[in-house]
């Protein structure tokens, strides 16, 4: 399996042979708080595809473990496996799903190229996906004064700086212990260090936040056009038309992350960009969105408790079964929570929301 994965990495995905695409199992490695993972999971839900999902816990540094680095040499989630195909980047995964599952029962999220809607959807998808969400994420942690009503615990701000050095030393140690992955670990260490220099620069952060406002102005205008061209008795439109598309996936997940970071009031609160505010409220009520991302902004539910269960499961002897696991949770829960607090900085550093990052 490892040899096959090494061969596939860096090459265009190959079609699985021997079975129809719909019959081959989809396997997704992701992390709940990874921005890129959230987009992929929402696409899977919108297309109603069956998929076996595996959490790669960033608080427990599972994305840095050798088995995962051999699966994806960048050590980033999400990663999709479909038969012989291994796809390691969110945009490529989404395009692969859209191009592979073409039966009539599977909803299409991208219009045909001949459609008048195609250029519009493609434009907004590319525009929204170009936003430096990783910089927003790191920046709001390092400089919380730029945010209002952030949903990230306050202690993360002080923890993150001490975790930066720990993450670098961890990658260095792993590089020494795994000679075959040394190049990959060193490359990841350099990428992390380089990005943090920019993301700790207040002037740079203010610049990209101003640029974000210009993008959201464009989205607000587009939503206003949809409202004006829709009859009163007509179906309420989405960003590019009547259908929920990949542009809506990008916009919905982007707004949800901005809310989490504490940038909602700045960008659509108090009557500012009312179309955007109405759109976000509508997205929150969408069944597929609520299923995938409904509780993701609640760190206790989406990260702390799952981490506690993961720690308890790893430490509980299997011979004693579930009863012991449940009993251990009372004591291990506190331990896991403290572990989570200690490593939350690393987790947030790994929220790579642009196509090449968490």
Curated annotation (Swiss-Prot):
- Region Required for mitochondrial localization: list its residue ranges: 320-358
What post-translational events are described?
A: Ubiquitinated by PRKN during mitophagy, leading to its degradation and enhancement of mitophagy. Deubiquitinated by USP30.
PROSITE patterns, per the entry: GST_CTER, GST_NTER
List the record's Gene Ontology CC terms alphabetically: cytosol; membrane; mitochondrial outer membrane; mitochondrion; nucleus; peroxisomal membrane
Topology with respect to the bilayer: Multi-pass membrane protein
The listed outcome for residue 282 to H is:
In CMT2K; recessive form
Which residue numbers delimit the GST C-terminal domain? Answer: 153-309
Q: Where is the GST N-terminal domain?
A: 24-105
Q: What is the effect of changing residue 161 to H?
A: In CMT4A; no effect on mitochondrial localization but abolishes mitochondrial fission
Q: Where is this cross-link: Glycyl lysine isopeptide (Lys-Gly) (interchain with G-Cter in ubiquitin)?
A: 50, 172-173, 188, 190, 203, 206-207, 214
Phenotype upon changing residue 116 to H: Impairment in the ability to induce mitochondrial fragmentation
N6-acetyllysine occurs at 203
**Record annotation: effect of changing residue 120 to G:** In CMT2K; dominant form
Print the keywords alphabetically: Acetylation, Charcot-Marie-Tooth disease, Coiled coil, Cytoplasm, Disease variant, Isopeptide bond, Membrane, Mitochondrion, Mitochondrion outer membrane, Neurodegeneration, Neuropathy, Transmembrane, Transmembrane helix, Ubl conjugation
Tissue-wise expression: Highly expressed in whole brain and spinal cord. Predominant expression in central tissues of the nervous system not only in neurons but also in Schwann cells.
Pfam families reported in the protein's UniProt record: GST_C_2, GST_N_3
Q: What is the effect of changing residue 156 to G?
A: In CMT2K; dominant form
Q: What does this protein do?
A: Regulates the mitochondrial network by promoting mitochondrial fission.
Q: Assembly and partners?
A: Homodimer.
The disease tied to this protein in UniProt is: Charcot-Marie-Tooth disease, demyelinating, type 4A: A recessive demyelinating form of Charcot-Marie-Tooth disease, a disorder of the peripheral nervous system, characterized by progressive weakness and atrophy, initially of the peroneal muscles and later of the distal muscles of the arms. Charcot-Marie-Tooth disease is classified in two main groups on the basis of electrophysiologic properties and histopathology: primary peripheral demyelinating neuropathies (designated CMT1 when they are dominantly inherited) and primary peripheral axonal neuropathies (CMT2).
Question: What protein name applies here?
Answer: Ganglioside-induced differentiation-associated protein 1
């Amino acid at each position: 399996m490892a040899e096959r994965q090494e061969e596939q990495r860096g090459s265009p995905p190959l079609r699985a042979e021997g079975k129809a695409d719909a019959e081959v199992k989809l396997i997704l490695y992701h992390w709940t708080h990874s921005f890129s993972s959230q987009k992929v999971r929402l696409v899977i839900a919108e297309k109603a595809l069956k998929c076996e999902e595996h959490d790669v816990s960033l608080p427990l540094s599972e994305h840095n473990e050798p088995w995962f680095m051999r699966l994806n040499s960048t050590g980033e989630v999400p990663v999709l496996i479909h038969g012989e195909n291994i796809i390691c980047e969110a945009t490529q995964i989404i395009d692969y799903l859209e191009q592979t599952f073409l039966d009539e029962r599977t909803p299409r999220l991208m219009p045909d190229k001949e459609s008048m809607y195609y250029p519009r959807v493609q434009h907004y998808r590319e525009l929204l996906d170009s936003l430096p969400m990783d910089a927003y994420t790191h920046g709001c942690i390092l400089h919380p004064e730029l945010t209002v009503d952030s949903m990230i615990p306050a202690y993360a701000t002080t923890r993150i700086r001490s975790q930066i050095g720990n993450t670098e030393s961890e990658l260095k140690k792993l590089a020494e212990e795994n000679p075959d992955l040394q190049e990959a670990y060193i490359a990841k260490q350099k990428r992390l260090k380089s990005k943090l220099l920019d993301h700790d620069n207040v002037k740079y952060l203010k610049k990209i936040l101003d640029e974000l406002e210009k993008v959201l102005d464009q989205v607000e205008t587009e939503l206003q056009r949809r409202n004006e061209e829709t009859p009163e008795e007509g179906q309420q439109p989405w960003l590019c038309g009547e259908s929920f598309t990949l542009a809506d996936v990008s916009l919905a997940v982007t707004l949800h992350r901005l809310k989490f970071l504490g940038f909602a009031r700045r960008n659509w609160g108090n009557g500012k960009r009312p179309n955007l505010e109405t759109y976000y409220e509508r997205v929150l009520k969408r069944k597929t969105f609520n299923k995938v991302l409904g509780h993701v902004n609640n760190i206790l539910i989406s990260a702390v408790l799952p981490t506690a269960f993961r720690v308890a499961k790893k430490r509980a002897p299997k011979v004693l079964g579930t009863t012991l696991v449940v009993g251990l949770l009372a004591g291990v829960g506190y331990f896991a929570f403290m572990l989570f607090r200690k490593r939350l900085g690393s987790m947030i550093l790994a929220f790579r929301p642009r196509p090449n990052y968490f």
